[in-house]
Amino acid sequence: MKRIGFWSITLIAILVVLCCATTALACTVVAVGKEASADGSTMVTHSCDGWYDHRVVVVPGGTHAEGEMVDIYRDPCQDTMVTPEKFGEVPQVAETYTYFNVAYPFMNEKGVLIGEHTWTGIDDVYNPEGMFVIANLEMLGLQRGSTAREVVQIMGDLAEQYGYGDGGEMLAVTDANEIWIFEIVGPGMLWKPESGEPGAHWAARRLADDEVFVGANRSRLGVIDFNDTENFMWSEGITDLPEQMGWWSEGEDFDFSKIFDSDRTGQFGSSRREWRAFDLLAPSLELPVIDGGSQYDFSIKPDEKVTMDDLFTIYNDHLEGTPYDQTVGVAAGPYGNPNRNSIKSDQIPESAQGYGFERKIAIHTCSYVFIGQARGWLPAEIGTKLWYGADDPSTTCYVPIYAGVTEVPEAWSIGDRRAFDQDSAWWAFNFVNNWAQLRWDAMYEEIHAERAKYMDQFMAEEADIDAEAAKLYEESPEKAAAFLTEYTNNAMNTVYEGWWDFAWRLVGKYYDGLCLEEDGSRTTLGMTNPDFVAASGIGETMIADMEAIYGTTTEEEAPAEEAPAEEAPAATEAPAEE
């Protein structure tokens, strides 16, 4: 195959990264240690913000023949936007596990969960000749690893052997016992696949069992303790390039984040989300507001044990009740809408150049979100499950997916993002979210009431489903898998069908600025955001005309018209027809 010049590839790749940066730098991850959770489970989350592959596909594991290869595709996470191209291949292993594929593969049958966020990092370590992007490593790690620690080591070893050709990434790799925060960047511009040198710089840090981690599109790993191999892992030769480049000197703390991430002074998109999630879980800390030039602690102890509801609340958040509340102010429009569409840089006032609207955790351009937990008192296929939500986290309805299921309904595995499709579950949630933009104040509450009908039921029956699955598991893991697959598929189909019904009910209820009640009566909802009404200029043109015409602003004060000086003569009658 003809090879394009190295620097041509580098330039193209960097341009692609920069073009995608506005959407790629947009994910939020929360991880909860087992002693920090209310029920003793580990928890991990991921909101995949931007245009990414939302389709959930179960990829079966199995045994493989010697010499079998695995195709590696570039940027598979954007498969609904562009068709990925094959970049290379690596040898397959003898046995693989079933895993769940989506933009960023997130679970396997062994109970390992992965949440992801992008942070890109400095250009000096980027190298497009590396074999893997982060989604490739997640796929291979979940196929081949049965614990979080093992998955981290597998991904790191593969990246070192074949090269990492992506920007800086963070993965929260979780099983029922521990959580590892894994971060990775490229090997440097001069690395070559045939060099025999490590093809990546990576490190991982174990989250303390009684603490909570939050990451939001910047490196959060901090200082690597090379004397603590129980709680840290790292790549071979990780200090070599930083020392050669003058980024680090022997005897200094090896701060992975400062060395490999870019300077984010004056940026708030990441730190604001970190602050908000930490503040919701530990308000007693009264964490200060910081920009991207500073870091919060790697992890914190929550004020109370964390529940699933706490995590759902975090992913509903639009900074309500804070100085940064996106539901108030002129930009929230007449109906208190927290969502902000992109604005061109030349439309931003000179005084605000370099800044933008506040970055909240829940955004309307999200592709999907999941909140997962691994419960060690049950077999992994039962104890590990995630709650998957399509589209905006604050308007979705989460559905349960157990690690042991063997398939999911087709409606959740399809959906071309370039063409509206009522056969796709994702489009149901995207449609409802878009319709809600018309009357956010009214429909947002109704959406939450509707999703509670489903989610409350799923939560209420969870203990019974777990118990029945565990009973069947003792007889046969296959029976348990069949039971969980049937349950999960029924739940997902119920929500898919119900959400389309709900969508059309909203269309028939909210239109033309009115709310149509079931009895046929119509209600004018008005404008509920006083900030917008006050700034809207309502009545200004008519007030100005009243002043111009009458010298006053009200009809009551307008002077009466004066009577004419003389009475007009009576009109002459027309002559009668003869």
PLM-predicted stretches and their roles:
Residues 1-11:
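Bacterial N-terminal signal peptides that target proteins for export
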Residues 14, 18-20, 559-578:
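Ser/Thr-rich, Proline-interspersed low-complexity disordered segments
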Residues 20-26:
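Sec/Tat signal peptide C-region and signal peptidase I cleavage site
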Residues 27-133, 154-306:
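A contiguous strand-loop segment
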Residues 124-128, 136-145:
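Second-shell loop/turn segments in exported
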Residues 237-382:
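Glycine-rich, aromatic-lined ligand/substrate-binding cores of catalytic
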Residues 337-471:
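Substrate-recognition/cap regions that form aromatic- and gly/pro-loop-enriched pockets
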Residues 451-561, 573:
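Histidine-centered catalytic/metal-binding microenvironments
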